[in-house]
Amino acid sequence: MSAVENNEIQSSGLTDLEVRILDFESNWWRFAGAKESAIKELFDLTAPRYYQLLNDLIDREDAMAAAPMLVKRLRRLREARMQARSAR
């Protein structure tokens, strides 16, 4: 995420943790295990707790206003996972 985008997010009314989560999610991970290790190291959260916070965050309008493309992508991914689960 660029410095300009990060400054826009910080001025959006989100908490520092929420800004860090959005910034973290803007990265791409090749392996799921690497991402989960980074979650523990950077946020001192378990992966399930991190994803609970993320799911709550991407439903909020201030997150959408701060990082619309990222939030839309995360919402699409979540919806696809939910549809795949319900199709089983």
Question: Language-model features: where?
Answer:
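Short acidic/polar alpha-helix capping motifs at helix-coil junctions
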Residues: 1-4, 76-78
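Short, Lys/Arg-enriched anionic-surface-contact patches
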Residues: 6-19
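Long, charge-rich, low-complexity intrinsically disordered regions
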Residues: 2-9, 86-88
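Amphipathic, hydrophobic secondary-structure cores in small proteins
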Residues: 20-78, 82
